[in-house]
Amino acid sequence: KKSVFGTNPICFGTQTNSKVPFILDTSMSMINRGKIRIAEKLGKKIPYGVALNKFGKPTTNAKEALAGVQLPIAGFRGSGLAWMVDILTGVFVGSNHGGKVKDPFDDFSGPQNIGHLFLAFKDNLFVKDYKKEIKKNIKRIKKIPNLKGQKIFYPGEQKFLSCLLYTSPSPRDAI
């Protein structure tokens, strides 16, 4: 079996009226290729249901997964999202698409000819007081009770706080 869609990420970021931005950066696959490569190097298995071998059968063997395909997030909905990303970053911008992108790890016969699409909006383009509204939105979502009683984090929040915790200030000239 051969991949048709890439595992290209979709990303979204916005201000939150605090120092911690809202950043969602997610792959279109159940597992990213880098994690499969690490599992292969360490001789570890990958989770069941995230990849197929070259014969189209589910595998937990990292080496087999690298020779096969990664499965999309959310089943057919994820395939639809991956297709959308393929159209936006391939067809729409005039780069390779639909399984024509060369494997960056195994195919060095020429350029990949990959595409990117970036969109930016002024935060108050549609709503006058965006920062006030996003603050209310985040506050409302964080108040929702969840099954385990754990704190709800918005996308990017844990990573940002982790970076603050494990990063020490450096002299300016060292950067």
Task: Go through each PLM region and give its residues.
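Single conserved hydrophobic/aromatic residue that forms the stacking wall/gate
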Residues: 166-169, 173-175
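Phosphate/diphosphate-binding glycine-rich loops and adjacent basic-rich segments that engage nucleotide
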Residues: 1-62
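Internal helical hairpin/lid segments
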Residues: 67-138
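A broadly conserved detector of short glycine/acidic/proline-rich loop/turn motifs that flank catalytic sites
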Residues: 16-18, 28, 77, 123-125, ...
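Structural motif
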Residues: 9-11, 20-23, 48-51, 70-71, ...
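C-terminal alpha-helical cap/extension of soluble enzyme domains
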Residues: 130-165
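Flexible loop/turn segments at secondary-structure boundaries
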Residues: 31-32, 125-128, 161-162
